[in-house]
Curated annotation (Swiss-Prot):
Subunit structure: Monomer.
Name under which the protein is recorded: Peptidyl-tRNA hydrolase
Entry binding sites for tRNA: 14, 64, 66, 113
Active site: 19 (proton acceptor)
Taxonomic lineage of the native organism: Bacteria, Fusobacteriati, Fusobacteriota, Fusobacteriia, Fusobacteriales
């Protein structure tokens, strides 16, 4: 079993913000796999699909970003998951250029409060896909809680497709090093 976790904040107010790229990516994956049902469980919105013979749960914590770990630990404990190999967390990263993604097997929170919350519950060893939202000269909170601008919006579909492909490979291929080599590059978005 795998759990694909997208981080974000619940509610209409936040749904199109940069900070919600994890929710947006999970919703895009659900669309790709034709999953329409979503239910509340583990303080999250949860949907599932059997993909290549393995149960995959798509998971969006509804605790608000800073408390994401409270939700994540519930599903890990319920299914007795090994965070090192059974979960993939997708979230925004201001330190990466917009459109870049980085896959990591472990590490610190990098100042991301959602990741900090998860680490406080399960430790630093879990697979994560960091999605670059760029750093702006303005206030960090204003930037992450701001909506994608027109230029970013034009590239968003292509970025989400890259994230889709990355997650699909992670679900079917066991060689994470090869996947990291392929995707941990500067963005290659067509203009």
């Amino acid at each position: 079993m795998k759990v694909v976790i997208g981080l974000g904040n619940p509610g209409k107010k936040y749904e199109k913000t940069r900070h919600n790229i994890g929710f947006i990516a999970v919703d895009n994956l659900r669309k790709k796999f034709n999953i329409s049902d979503e239910r509340e469980k583990f303080q999250a919105l949860v949907s599932e699909k059997n993909i290549d013979g393995e149960k995959v749960i798509f998971f969006k914590p509804q605790t608000f970003m800073n408390l994401s770990g409270n939700s994540v630990i519930e599903i890990i404990n319920f299914y007795k998951l090994d965070p090192k190999k059974d979960i993939i967390v997708i979230y925004d990263d201001m330190d990466l250029s917009f459109g870049d993604i980085r896959i990591r097997e472990k590490g610190s929170s990098g100042g991301h409060n959602g990741i900090k919350s998860i680490i406080s519950h399960i430790g630093e060893e879990f697979i994560r896909i960091k999605c670059g939202i760029g750093a702006k000269e303005r206030d960090a909170v204003e930037h992450v809680l701001g909506e994608f601008n027109q230029t970013e919006q034009k590239d968003l579909d292509e970025i989400l497709e890259k994230i889709n492909n990355c997650v699909i490979e992670m679900l079917s291929v066991q060689n994470l090093d090869r996947i990291m080599q392929k995707y941990n590059k500067k963005k290659e978005i067509s203009k």
